[in-house]
Amino acid sequence: MFRVGSWLYGKKPAANASTQSLDSLVELRDLEDAMRAATLILNDDVDGAEAGLAEGTSAFHNLGRGVVAFIRATLGFEQDIMRQASERLNEAETSASVDQHRAQHNSYAPNTYHSPMYLPGTEFALCQAIAQLMSAIVGVLNESLTESIKAFYRLRKAYITLDAILKMEQKYMEESRAATLVESTTSGSVPSSLRHSSSNLHSSSSSISSAKGKEAAADTLAAPSNDTDVQERLADLNLSGEPAVAEDPGQTPTPINTDILDHDPDSDIFQNQIDVFVHSGSNFCFGVLLLLISMVPPSFSKLLSIIGFHGDKERGLKMLWQASKFHNLIGGIAAFAILGYYNGFVRYCDIMPDSIPGKDGDVQGYPQKRLELLLAKMRERFPKSQLWLLEESRMSGANKNLDRALELLCGEERSPLKQVEALRVFERSLNAMYLHKYELCADSFLECVDLNSWSRSLYYYIAGSCHLSLYRDAKETDSAKAAKHAELAEKYFRMAPTVAGKKRFMARQLPFDVFVARKFAKWEARAKEWKVSLVDAVGVDPIEEMIFFWNGHSRMTDEQLQESLQKLAWSESSANTTWSREGPEEKAILKLLRAAVHRSLRKHTQAKEMLEDILGQDRTLFKGHLKDDWICPVAHFEMAANLWMERPTYIATHGGAKQDSNKESARPASVNDALQYEREKVRKCKEYLEKAAKWESYELDARIGLKVTAAMEAVQKWESTHPTL
């Protein structure tokens, strides 16, 4: 078994590697130049970023080029950009590997940088880990299953490197604390802060920065020189003297070092920009890694066995927040990841952990003030970027101000970065959909067709659905207008399945592509059977269905939710001449959508009654050719969400439910009764979630699975803080 240092630094340099030492000033200049140039992309200046990075050939410049391509790839999901990102990141990984070995080989050179915290060459090991992590994410987004599987192995490689770096930080803090204690005992005084003990940190007897100690460790624990077989090396590696990661899928990573996360960028331990890069970069990468793995839905859980470790949402978020403190490229990307997570994922999920009071404690809830400060900081740093304006819009929407969210995205200014512009138009499309602004929504989604190739079938489908709603609104009052919208609705509905299946995720069709193709086939079959036009064969309002799938209800005010109920009421109105022909499936969809709106209105009694009616039916009614097989598992999740929102703790934070039933609205009389009441709600909530999690494969299971995974984690956290006596 090998320790951390043996793998990262004990390997002999390649035979053809240059033995020229890395001058610390040159290395620092390369790092600063590369990061400064790459950071320009966060201000929408992709040309400036590319030009600046083209001026250098260092490992940092190569990584910068890879990061720029990665950002563009993840913003737009376009295959050509993803290929470019993959190539650049591979080049960056190779370049960093050469420099890492050279730095280790020449660690005694007088002009090389010797970090008090990290072993020689750690900055290049981090470059490799960043390249591996980003390459893995691109691989997962790739349409090839082979590339997707390879991506999970890259994640494991990055994990091992990052965990090793964190162990260096942990050892540094432990030894500095021990040195401080020794000095305190000797002098009889206790320093007020570790920052004042910096003189001890460089002691040859206690500091891990000792060059002799590093060399001795490298010589004693030298790794095999032949490392061509990556899997063999990973399997043999041991980071802690316990079973290797690959052998124990449940192994817990290095415990989080809260001491170092309490240090801000102006701390004495971050005096050198190379150390700043390593600390911020390792926290960002490990934070992203832990966060992403924690979000994997049940349908992809088998892939976790490839990685060999579990995610940790709370720890990952704390590390991302730490990385965001730094005024560099890493800090900017970390801020973007944080804002995207809270304003996207958290607001998409309905069951999340309760907020924790105290400064910086609420990392798993929605720390609104902290997010607002972070966004303001990024807007100030990158005033020309539409990316941060987009995040401001998302934040407004997440806080039920959809009008403001839409207004921010309707300005005349355009981003020169095509991927950012595509995101802006897509977000504008969604906000218009939530606000029932059908014409703007349709036009915006059609604009998405030209800007992005990711899911054109969905764009056409929603555009057609908007015109269907306009057709229904005008059907009884303006026949000419109704005919116009009916024609456009049918046109876009027919275009949608022709472009479905063009894109793939891990070799599988995109969930909404499958959904759209099935819906169209279902409507066509009904039109033929009922002898009506395609638009008259459509069932429950597909726009309301889309609002539900994108969790638009959580962003809507009560007035906007009432408008959704009015739109849903059309199905049972006299204007709908085909409702009498509908079977239990379409009627269940109507009940489910109404229940979701009532839950958002905090009318849980009504919502649960509708859901109980659905769950009381034979589940086989919703299975079969062209059927909406997602109804029952989603109804289970909705029931769980209602129960979670009825808890006293939830009500204390978000306000009480609007109930008609005195029985349901009655509050427990005592604290003990309240806890017992809440425990019962959580127990029932968990039962419904477990049923949803174990449901057989169904349409959109990966999408719904994200909610289920987050919900199960929230329940587990509640149980851990409320143990049964």
UniProtKB/Swiss-Prot annotation:
Q: Where is this region: Disordered?
A: 187-209
State the source organism's domain of life.
Eukaryota
Pfam families membership: Iml2-TPR_39
GO annotation, cellular component aspect: cytoplasm; nucleus
Keyword Nucleus appears in the UniProt entry: yes
> Mostly located where?
cytoplasm
Alphabetical list of InterPro entries matching this protein: Iml2/TPR_39
Location of this chain's protein in the cell: Cytoplasm; Nucleus
Instruction: Name the UniProt key words of this record, in alphabetical order.
Output: Cytoplasm, Nucleus, Phosphoprotein
Q: What does this protein do?
A: Inclusion body (IB) resident protein that interacts strongly with lipid droplet (LD) proteins. Involved in LD-mediated IB clearing after protein folding stress, probably by enabling access to the IBs of an LD-stored soluble sterol derivative that acts as a chaperone in inclusion clearing.
The record's family statement is:
Belongs to the IML2 family.
Q: Which PANTHER family match?
A: TETRATRICOPEPTIDE REPEAT PROTEIN 39 FAMILY MEMBER, TETRATRICOPEPTIDE REPEAT PROTEIN 39C
Kindly state the subunit structure of this protein. Interacts with lipid droplet proteins.
Q: What is this protein called?
A: Inclusion body clearance protein iml2
**Name of encoding gene:** iml2
